[in-house]
Amino acid sequence: MTYHAIGRFIGNFSYLEYQLRFFLIDKIKLDSKFHNALITHDFSLLCTAVQEVHRQTTEPEVYDRLKKLISRVREFNDLRVKVVHGTWFPYQEGGTLLHVSRHSLQDHYTEEMAEYLEQQAELMFDINLEMMTIFLRGRDYPDEEEPAVTGTT
């Protein structure tokens, strides 16, 4: 169960990151020959760029909601760092994670991480759908309706 939870969480995070990059590229109409240059930016900078572009191009209430979602997405990234760089004890107490803070060098054990990661993966998926709805709302769709945002985990 632990390995499944880790994979699901990281997979959902990867898709979320891809979506953020795609919609930023689309919003600023970046020429395709420059797409790879955007891929090299770190996740936090990507979040800042998405937020700043939308601050200047969307209605205040939409921007405020997106800002809250981006804040939550940054929390997912903090968790991702722990998941990826921590030490796992997959068969102990529902998946135990040992993380050592780079800032304080203090270690912290967290038990029952498999269930928690499953919950966070589900929440991340829902937040990604909501952000996609915001991003798609601002696109131009000539002579047709905007596409519906649907999906499953």
Q: Which stretches of residues belong to each language-model region?
A:
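Short, glycine/alanine-rich amphipathic alpha-helical segment
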Residues: 41-68, 102-119
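Acidic interhelical loop/turn segments
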Residues: 88-108
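Generic N-terminal initiation segments characterized by hydrophobic and/or small/turn-forming residues
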Residues: 63, 94-95, 114, 126, ...
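Amphipathic alpha-helical interface elements
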Residues: 1-52, 71-85, 89-91, 120-149
